[in-house]
Curated annotation (Swiss-Prot):
Encoding gene (name): CCL4
Pfam families per the UniProt record, alphabetical: IL8
Location within or outside the cell: Secreted
Alphabetical UniProt keywords: Chemotaxis, Cytokine, Disulfide bond, Inflammatory response, Secreted, Signal
BP term (GO), one: chemokine-mediated signaling pathway
Disulfide bonding pattern of the chain: 34-58, 35-74
Subunit structure: Homodimer. Interacts with CCR5.
Name of the protein: C-C motif chemokine 4
Organism: Sus scrofa (Pig)
Family classification: Belongs to the intercrine beta (chemokine CC) family.
Length: 92
């Protein structure tokens, strides 16, 4: 009986120290995609297929546009053309 309790305790300790999900506080993962610069040129609308907004954990807000060729382009969310493209993509 003592052996079972010892083995079980050891397994619990190993699981607690080896599992990052159990040992890290919730929400502590760093953001996976952040933009540090914005494009200086307006993208042609017919090049853009999709978009997403970066995480609020990033140092600056950004909209990332996906192009037909699979490229990702960071844009300033306060630019008028960016808002227009986002609205257009939401409607389609």
């Amino acid at each position: 009986m003592k052996l079972c309790v010892t083995v079980l305790s050891l397994l619990v300790l190993v699981a607690a120290f080896c599992s990052p999900a159990l040992s890290a506080p919730m929400g502590s993962d760093p953001p996976t995609s952040c933009c540090f610069t914005y494009t200086v040129r307006k993208l042609p609308r017919n090049f853009v297929t999709d978009y997403y907004e970066t995480s609020s954990l990033c140092s600056q807000p950004a909209v990332v546009f996906q192009t037909k060729k699979g490229r990702q382009v960071c844009a300033n969310p306060s630019d008028d053309w960016v808002q227009e493209y986002m609205d257009d993509l939401e409607l389609n």
